[in-house]
Amino acid sequence: MSRLNLSFASCDYDHMRDLVSGKVRPEGIDLTPLTFDEPHLIFHQATHFSDFDVCELSFGRYVSLVSTGDNDKIALPVFPSRVPRIGALFVRAGSKIKRPEDLAGARVGLPEWAI
């Protein structure tokens, strides 16, 4: 069976180095890793030019694409650190939000949002 050729863009994260260096090889895949200094550079190239087969993409960027009708990307919930990066929500002092249920129907801010 032939192997699948995939380009993969990531930043130089310690938890991705073995994959990027080739020390860890995905079964059945010939991976061409591309490393970037900043995630926003990956996000820009991936969304404007579709330069990569696989890459990280912020949740904010993905949601903004889908909200404009751009359904060309498929999001996979893969968390190499084994947890989502956004582990907390911050609420304004004096807010009526005291429990997660209080967020139903509320607006939330994201650290990265592209329109």
Model segments located where?
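Small-molecule-sensing regulatory modules
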Residues: 1-6
